[in-house]
């Protein structure tokens, strides 16, 4: 019976490249001359630090742009609160990986409401979809892509 998995993953290498490109862009931008500003990547959290709140917003736009260029979906961004420490503003951005339980339940409910003849089940941080026909699975893929679940979805492990 054909099946596939719906997962939410990011490529950490591409995130690392995007952060390096963003740091490079910071060093060439005129409005960031003479300003202590940087991006730092540790595990799957990017920390932005600079002198003002306004510059943090600009840095976030730079990071979004470089992530899009590298093929990282910005829907995976989870922005944390801005911290003001002395004269430095810091903000952390975590990348969501894996489909959380409530999102997985919404996805399964959406598939069942569409009345497509498939079975969907939660397996850890992914959703497995099985069905008798490939066409049904492709309908589920189209449905998942068109859904607005605030999380990027990829399809892996397609088996016949």
UniProtKB/Swiss-Prot annotation:
Disulfide bonds: none annotated. GO terms for molecular function: nucleotide binding. InterPro entries: DUF520, UPF0234-like_C, UPF0234_N, YajQ-like_sf. One of its GO terms (cellular component) is cytosol. The keyword Oxidoreductase does not apply. Keywords: Nucleotide-binding. It comes from the Bacteria. Belongs to the YajQ family. Nucleotide-binding protein. This is Nucleotide-binding protein Patl_4311.
